[in-house]
Amino acid sequence: MKTKQLTIVLTVVAIISASIFSSCRKKEKEEIDNDTAGASDQSLASSSVNDLTSISDEAAKTYTISSFKTAETNAILSSCATITFDTLAAAKTITVNFGATNCLGNDGRYRRGALKIAFTGKYRDSLTLITVTPQSYFVNDNQITGSKTIKNLGHNAANHLVYEINANISIIKASGGGTITWQSARQREWTAGESTLTWSDDIYSITGSANGTTSNGNTFTSVITSPLIRNMSIGCRRHFTQGLLQHTPGGKATRYIDFGNGACDSDATVTINGTNYNITLP
């Protein structure tokens, strides 16, 4: 009798255990993938790369050798940034020094350290190559290392200047937030403002792809599926105002990032497995 009771008890325990195990497995399968941190890291890295270009553009405007626009200054750079120009070196070099303490730019970002910008010719001349190298450089306390090159490819069929931009950078996030690595190959088309001397009427259309690792160590790839629009007017220049991008973290579903329809804000939408999540761009 005791043996039968023990058998019944063990059978019940086995059934309950199997039920619990099955329930746990079901919960694991139903776990919602809603992590947008990787998409935010991607946006931070992309924005940082574009910021390097914007600063090098503005710094060179001060000097006629570069054939940059000269009618408008201090679009991003404020009075705490010092610009020096070396004409004696074989490759002309501009250094933008923000100092050892945070320098607030006109775009609302804090910077310190320096950027070294070397160029082989005038910005508007075909095949001119510009190399931007950060030197103990921080933006909003995130350290940026590596380098970026900008090559003038001349005018396209629409008579717009096109630049090939390659970047290989790392971003060491503030407060021990991890490190983002980023390698990208993109093209930037100057779609508006080339014919004027006003920097804030410039608009750029950007295409291309990137790959790297997020701050939590996960690999990713990203592809621009609809050109990202960079509007350099006041209030717009900090973030992309339009465009679509596919961000695919290793082992997870693709994140579809929509930067909006042209509004000058820091809002974007990330779609994961058909569900939309609103994020604020860093």
Which role does the model predict for each range below?
Residues 2-10:
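Bacterial N-terminal signal peptides that target proteins for export
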Residues 19-23:
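C-terminal motif of bacterial Sec signal peptides marking the signal peptidase cleavage site
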Residues 25-282:
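Low-complexity, intrinsically disordered segments exposed to solvent
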